[in-house]
Amino acid sequence: MKRIRDLWVRTNLIKKIGIGVVIGLLLGILLPDVTAIGILGQLFVGALKAIAPLLVFALVVQAISHQRSGQQTNMTLIIVLYLLGTFLAALVAVIANYLFPLTLTLNTSVNTELSPPQGIVQVFQTLLLKLVDNPINALATANYIGVLAWALIFGLALKSVPSDFKHLIKTAADVTSQIVVWIINVAPIGIMGLVFSTVSENGISILSDYALLILVLVGTMLFVALVVNPLLAFVLTHQNPYPLVFRCLKDSGLTAFFTRSSAANIPVNLQLCEDLGLSQATYLVSIPLGAMINMGGAAITINVLTLAAVNTFGIQIDFLTALLLSVVAAISACGASGVTGGSLLLIPVACSLFGISSDLAMQVVGVGFIVGVIQDSCETALNSSTDVLFTAIAEKAFWKQKKA
């Protein structure tokens, strides 16, 4: 027994989740009547639902309050690329939804009262009202729009406080993140329960939906990595971008695929920037910053799963509303940094725009965790490799302009 326990401790989370998916699948086929197994999935989703609003608030306050001013001029273009790249990734995900519309199988017996918006005007009205919600109520009711707004305000107000107090803020954010790590560490058990419930209630054919979901997610990320990002690079440098793109994917993306953490991949990216001969004064700032705000993969995940939920409930949205979703997803994705599965925890932010309740949104998050073995790895690979790519093309564009 001790050998089995030690082997389990040494096994990385990706393999554990894969094992959980397989066990849940087998139990759902062989023992569909043992419904108690499904409670494990409910507990896992419940724990995520409880900590997610506090996590978003703590991380955003910490990031804004510690943001430094006086960046050198070259950073301006890099930041613009980070934000533009994230928005374009979200927009590509919207287009992918129109080309390959997905639906999800959810338990709609739980709090299914939906209030779909009537076009862009009502969406803005709902957004503005949620912005001014009581901050305590926003945390308690999982009003993520309000949580983000108040976190931004508190972060800006705390920028001028003494460094000792900022350290306390960072400690609070670290503690909250650690709690999430503990919850994520039991993800294999929770996902086993989720897979069991899905298979036992809907049959084995339900897995074909997840296969299509994975294909759309990964396909969209590949399109951004191999078409959208190289196009941005070509527009700025007027050079063939693919040697640099493939170098970043090979040396940065491959490592990030397995670590599943942009923050953990920072040392790899710094070394790659040095190997590429980039300015140290620039990449020492841009790479850590990119790990926080360059979240194209996260924006794709948020939009694909949110729009799948929208399709599931038959909510009709116009293109302007979908465009607003891209903006919200891009902004929300910036809060996903440094947290395993962080993009999934921010799906309720986007779902709330369409009147989808928190309970149903967390079921969508549960679906995300089921496919997360592949989704999170590909997402991190895209995010982290793009940090180096945008840093490099910004510097190339800077020198090109200077020579001209």
UniProtKB/Swiss-Prot annotation:
Signal peptide: none annotated. It catalyses: L-serine(in) + Na(+)(in) = L-serine(out) + Na(+)(out); L-threonine(in) + Na(+)(in) = L-threonine(out) + Na(+)(out). This is Serine/threonine transporter SstT. Involved in the import of serine and threonine into the cell, with the concomitant import of sodium (symport system). It comes from the Bacteria. The chain crosses the membrane at residues 17-37, 44-64, 75-95, 138-158, 179-199, 212-232, 287-307, 319-339, 354-374. It is a multi-pass membrane protein. One of its GO terms (biological process) is threonine transport. GO terms for molecular function: neutral L-amino acid:sodium symporter activity. It is found in: Cell membrane. It comes from Streptococcus equi subsp. zooepidemicus (strain H70). Belongs to the dicarboxylate/amino acid:cation symporter (DAACS) (TC 2.A.23) family. Keywords: Amino-acid transport, Cell membrane, Membrane, Symport, Transmembrane, Transmembrane helix, Transport. One of its GO terms (cellular component) is plasma membrane. Its main location: membrane.
